[in-house]
């Protein structure tokens, strides 16, 4: 993962490129949609009150339209998402299905995006065919679009580039590639910002959509609080953020799963 020194648009935090080993996992073919997230939002078997330990709460309704009129039902991606909101959706899925889902690590995301390639984009080193695969600045009309309308990568994953940027599990670290971990690398967050997103979004230029590009989360993404007290669920000023989920092939123990969600959610 990472980019070579000669890659056009390369930034200093993308290398040196290195080989990693990942445990097997499945990844969602598309970004989680508004309809899918709305099922969580409307699930009345869970409360919107302050949770007890280990409990599930539903998102509190924002006071503004976080889609900015770009679209909701019918396959549009869930947007304006915080990492907390994305992980609570994963926790809800686990409680509903007994299957453990989570966000991908930065390494898992990039590996899946590349789909076996070492080029700047999953299809080539240049941007000639980018519009066939991605919604971005040149073709999006400055809005996100329904998922899976563009071509997938070689592994059948849609919208890995553009549309909405996607959360990973990692704390952003400029020196990520100098870390020694080569097996299942993960930088566990210790602060809310910056954390790492990948993929670029509908308003980005082509260089931001490269497989190796890294995005730092920013507290300015929630300057206008959609809730009082400060929302953990939404990023009111970042309609370009969504997520997709993964499922490890080897299911962790219930104790490990509970520890995972507690570590990420309790002090967010």
Task: Please name every model-derived segment.
Residues 74-77, 147-148, 152, 228-234:
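Active-site rim elements
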Residues 16, 28, 77, 146, ...:
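Glycine/small-residue-rich pyrophosphate-binding loop that anchors the diphosphate of NDP-sugar donors
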Residues 10-18, 117, 141-143, 164-268:
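Surface-exposed recognition segments
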Residues 134-161, 189-191:
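Short, well-ordered junction/capping motifs at the entry into regular secondary structure
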Residues 118-144:
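Chymotrypsin/trypsin-fold serine protease catalytic domain
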């Amino acid at each position: 993962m990472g980019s070579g020194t000669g890659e056009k648009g390369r930034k200093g935090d993308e290398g040196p490129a290195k080989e990693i080993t990942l445990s097997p996992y499945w990844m969602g073919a598309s970004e989680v949609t508004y309809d899918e997230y709305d099922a969580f939002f409307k699930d009345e078997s869970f409360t919107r009150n302050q949770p007890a330990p280990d409990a599930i709460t539903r998102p509190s309704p924002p006071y503004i339209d976080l889609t900015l009129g770009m679209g909701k039902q019918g396959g549009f991606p869930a947007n304006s998402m915080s990492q907390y909101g994305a992980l609570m959706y994963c926790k809800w899925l686990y409680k509903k299905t007994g299957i453990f889902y989570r966000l991908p690590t930065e390494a898992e995301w990039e590996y899946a995006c590349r789909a076996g390639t070492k080029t700047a984009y999953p299809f080539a080193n240049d941007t000639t065919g980018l519009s066939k695969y991605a919604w971005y600045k040149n073709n999006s009309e400055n809005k996100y679009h329904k998922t899976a309308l563009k071509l997938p990568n070689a592994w059948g994953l849609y919208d890995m580039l553009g549309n909405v940027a996607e959360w990973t599990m990692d704390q952003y670290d400029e020196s990520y590639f100098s870390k020694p971990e080569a097996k299942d690398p993960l930088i566990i967050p210790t602060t809310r910002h910056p954390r790492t997103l990948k993929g670029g979004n509908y308003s980005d230029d082509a260089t931001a959509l490269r497989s190796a590009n890294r995005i730092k989360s920013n507290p300015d993404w929630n300057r206008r609080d959609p809730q009082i007290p400060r929302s953990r669920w939404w990023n009111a000023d970042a309609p370009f953020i969504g997520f997709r989920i993964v499922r490890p092939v080897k299911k962790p123990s219930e104790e490990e799963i509970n520890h995972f969600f507690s570590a990420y959610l309790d002090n967010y």
